[in-house]
Design a protein with these regions (language model features):
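N-terminal helical cap/lid subdomain that shapes the substrate entry/recognition surface
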Residues: 2-95
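Conserved phosphate-coupling serine/threonine residues in phosphotransfer and NTP-handling enzymes
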Residues: 12, 115-117
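Alpha-helix N-cap/helix-start and coil->helix boundary motif
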Residues: 20-21, 56, 98, 118-120, ...
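Substrate-recognition "cap/lid" segment bordering the active-site pocket of phosphatases
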Residues: 118-159
Length: 159
């Protein structure tokens, strides 16, 4: 039996900055213009450093003094903006990813995704990219109470 391969998604398979950076800019604009929050300018490389963090950790590290209510609303705005971009077919996988996945699948590997994303985000991508062609499952951190990936892998292994 072949091993089961578990891939990260954002920044590994999915060229996330393509939709993440504009979505963050939208949320930052809302905080500045409608909430009067002094949000520092964020270069792309800083936004890229947040890939792999769950939403809560990202906002807590970036604007720790911001009230939770505003963090949640800004995160929701960014998430909605990303979903809109996926539905508008602006999301993209890195070049060559499909070929690699086709090769692995043809060699009998079972594959899954494990991501620090929200459940709704994973579902949108699953549908947009027809991910069932390659993957058995898309595990998101929201479903597991935002547990660390190491804990989620242990949970997955028990099923």
């Amino acid at each position: 039996m072949k091993p089961h391969l578990i891939f990260d998604y954002d920044g590994t398979i999915h060229d996330t900055l393509r939709i993440y950076f504009p979505a963050l800019q939208k949320a930052f604009r809302w905080l500045r213009e409608e909430q009067g929050v002094d949000v520092p300018e964020v270069p792309r490389h800083q936004a890229a450093s947040w890939l792999g963090m769950n939403t809560r950790d990202m906002w807590n590290s970036f604007l720790p003094g911001l009230p939770m209510e505003l963090k949640q609303k800004a995160a929701l705005l960014a998430g909605e903006a990303m979903a809109e971009q996926v539905r508008a077919h602006r999301a993209a996988w890195y070049p060559g990813v499909r070929d690699v996945l086709d090769t692995l699948k043809s060699r009998g590997f079972h594959m899954s995704i494990l991501s620090n994303c929200q459940r709704s985000y994973g579902l949108i991508h699953w549908e947009e990219f027809g991910m069932d062609r390659w993957f058995d499952a898309f595990y998101d951190c929201e479903t597991y109470g935002h547990a660390p990936k190491s804990g989620i892998i242990l949970e997955i292994g028990r099923t």
